[in-house]
């Protein structure tokens, strides 16, 4: 039968071929869907009916965190939908997500084989990789071991705290005393995101590479400016991820995405190569050195099951650098917006710092127990902004079930963190910004049980490996900023806090005024 159609191939146009191929794929998927056998005692996932070829893309829209939240109200905490030709599922509700990612962690620990993911760190990314479970776990363990050996997370007075504090103090001082003050004197306003993102990137560079860049260094600026388009593609998905035939058609978006990743890789590869040249096992200078050290040890270990290649080192460092500065800088940028929107909260934070830390020294991580309102403010920023609306998509590693519903192997699973953080069954008046919800009744202590309900870094086996550094970095930078600066809007310009969807949701860029606290 196949041989009979070969003579006609040369007379068929490209468009006709694509239509034919799409039709075949569509028929196959429809037949596959209706032939899916549901094990006895389980139910088929509920969800909206998909359109041919595009699935439920139109219903998901450009604000999927809102549309999928609306669908969860209709279909429940576990439902299916289709993005193009890819069967997908969405998990909402704190109990459901915790059950999936913790109790059934192995079954939901995979990553979908999305076309765009193959180009992130040349396919060597620890966060986006589809490596088999054993390989991925071994590499994650090595990465965490390298991070721990550099940061000594297990000690009561962590070495990473000292390093993080050192870099944060230097960058915080440069941020408020040099950059912001100089900019304010010249222009009368400043773009908070522009300066925060470079300062944070320098802290991450110090941790990963042991070096600092000037705030006008063009190489660093060009790289940090790539985080937005990267997040937009990963967050919204590339059409080729969900309609496979599009992989073979030219795409400006995909070309730009590949260029972004190539530039990131080139930057990190250069630094890793330099570290190999100057590496001294008796002088581990930073996270890159620590990863090289673990890599060398495993090369010498004949019994090691998984060898970590040089490319994997680049991928891990790239993950830590990219995710670290983007997460912290986005959180801090939102923090400044909330400080401006709620001046009475800004004043409470300043008074807490003034009374418990003073104004003559830089805040330290050991001050955290004495700054419960600042801790509550950070948690409420994480919850209210939900600037990480979804985790990186998960994938089922085998046929499984959840809440009585059958979920087939290789289902792309979205974890709706935004829904959890705005669930009225979990939070009183979730739309209001209220840091006091995380304090004890007398307002003197942080309510840690309430804080644990906030979903921001994922859960379980795929939980963000850099969570500790991210939380500590946000705390240190924000404490320094509140201690030294007071923010205001420009006269006649309203504050626009409308989020723009992406892997991390940003607010619209704006200009603000700032005054030094010491000069007030």
Swiss-Prot record:
It holds the Pfam family p450. Its main location: endoplasmic reticulum. Disulfide bonds: none annotated. It is a peripheral membrane protein. Keywords: Endoplasmic reticulum, Heme, Iron, Membrane, Metal-binding, Microsome, Monooxygenase, Oxidoreductase. Substrate binds at residue 230. It is found in: Endoplasmic reticulum membrane; Microsome membrane. The keyword ATP-binding does not apply. InterPro entries: Cyt_P450, Cyt_P450_CS, Cyt_P450_E_grp-I, Cyt_P450_E_grp-I_CYP1, Cyt_P450_sf. Its cofactor is heme. It catalyses: an organic molecule + reduced [NADPH--hemoprotein reductase] + O2 = an alcohol + oxidized [NADPH--hemoprotein reductase] + H2O + H(+). One of its GO terms (molecular function) is steroid 17-alpha-monooxygenase activity. Heme binds at residue 464. Its EC number is 1.14.14.1. GO terms for cellular component: endoplasmic reticulum membrane. GO terms for biological process: hormone biosynthetic process; progesterone metabolic process. PANTHER family: CYTOCHROME P450 1A, STEROID 17-ALPHA-HYDROXYLASE/17,20 LYASE. Cytochromes P450 are a group of heme-thiolate monooxygenases. In liver microsomes, this enzyme is involved in an NADPH-dependent electron transport pathway. It oxidizes a variety of structurally unrelated compounds, including steroids, fatty acids, and xenobiotics. Belongs to the cytochrome P450 family. This is Cytochrome P450 1A1.
